[in-house]
Amino acid sequence: MSSADIARRAGGITERSVRYRLERLVSSGIIRVSAVADPKALGYPVLADVFIEVEPGQIMTVARTMTEFECVTYVACSTGASDLSIQIVAPDNAGLYRFVTEVVANVAGVRKTTTVLLPLVLKDVYQWTIPKSTCTD
């Protein structure tokens, strides 16, 4: 959406003000402007979360290893039943299965994996908006 469109939708603000505010938000690191590819459109319609239990002392090593795989879209350290959470995309269920059982399971330090297919995503991270209760001007 252009700065002019934002100014029109907001009402009472100039395009120049919108550009200035956006530049401030970007330069301060509050927002990032980036393109997000649609995995389905690129031939990766299968999406899954994989929860990983890791050997003690190996969490960061395994986490860093997971970031190196192209089909892994998200890596996070977690608490609770699993130590890591990753999200992966695959061309089909067989590809997902192979990646989890032949790649993830064989990474040094991985103790156990639990895979959850995500057939429908209603809201993705790039759709998050700042809660009105925390907005200040």
Q: What are the residue ranges of the model-derived segments?
A:
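A compositional/biophysical signature of low hydrophobicity enriched in polar/charged and small residues
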Residues: 1-137
